[in-house]
Amino acid sequence: MPNRRHFIQRSATLLALAAAAPWLPRFAFAADPTQLLQRAIPSSGEKLPVIGLGTSRTFDVRLDDASLKPLDEVLRTFINGGARLIDTAPSYGASEAVTGELLKRTNTQGKAFLATKISATGRERGMAQFEASLKALQTDKLDLVQVHNLQDTRTQLALLRELKAQGKVRYIGITHYIESAHDDLLAVLAQEPVDFVQLNYSVGERNAEKRLLPYCADHGIATLINRPFQRAQLLSRVKGRALPDWAMETDATSWAQLLLKFILANQAVTAVIPATSNPRYMADNLQAGQGRLPDAALRAKIVQAFT
């Protein structure tokens, strides 16, 4: 049965063929964007491709050609595959600067939906951090800015509303990455209007299904999902195992795709943002945004496979 290694080997073969014969179909590395599932941002109706790109750790590299080369390929694969949403943060080391440089090098600044965060205490520090993000990302406005891990939430949301009114930010939101913070996210949502919530949700962390995701669906709040693989912990559980036959019913060809499709099958999810520094993993992840999604019975089988 196909697995992630099989997919990567097949992708490498097709890449070699494409280099030798550029008239051949480009497979997932230049997939038809219309094949990538899109979902609407409830507050505006604007549609986003369901597969985004996280940059935590993976984009925290030196700004030299050797370090940027694989990430350049990741970004080209991402954009050529019809995806748009890139999520970064000032606390991710060099990730913002690397993202900005790569977008400039690939001339894809106008194609990306840029999301970053504020993790500061006090309005002045929040504003300074926002301005530093603009400089690092080489832009004069951002699509989405989120209060990172609910740090000084009310102060920073007030600032973000000002920036939104000025046209410097299109959407605002809040984030967290642990299940124990879900009640805190809900408490903020009950009092503060936002466009987006970013949260952790995966086969191994399903607490969001109980209250947080239903609340967002009912109140028109877009959701971005982080930690879809739990920092690769979930993939390590199935390393070396072949995909079960029933995975074909979801059109998944790797365990990673199966994990992402599990998340996307929840209609309250707007997009998922797996991070990677590997172009072939990026192509693999994009495949999860195409084809069929698992129904309730198949989702139960996916959970069992990782238990």
Feature roles, as predicted:
Residues P2-G110:
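N-terminal binding-site loop/beta-alpha segment at the start of enzyme catalytic domains
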Residues L14-L17, W23, I41, R211-T307:
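Structured C-terminal cap/extension of enzyme domains
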Residues Q38, L75, E96, G100, ...:
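Generic structural signal for well-ordered alpha-helices
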Residues I41, L53, I86, T99, ...:
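Conserved, mostly hydrophobic/aromatic
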Residues G52-R57, T88-P90, T116-I118, Q146-N149, ...:
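A cross-domain feature marking catalytic cores of carbohydrate-active enzymes
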Residues R62, T121-N207, R211, D218-L224, ...:
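Glycine/proline-rich, positively charged
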Residues F78, N107, K164, C216-A217:
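A generic structural signal for well-ordered alpha-helical segments
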Residues G100-N107, F113, D284-G291:
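Short, electropositive alpha-helical surface patch
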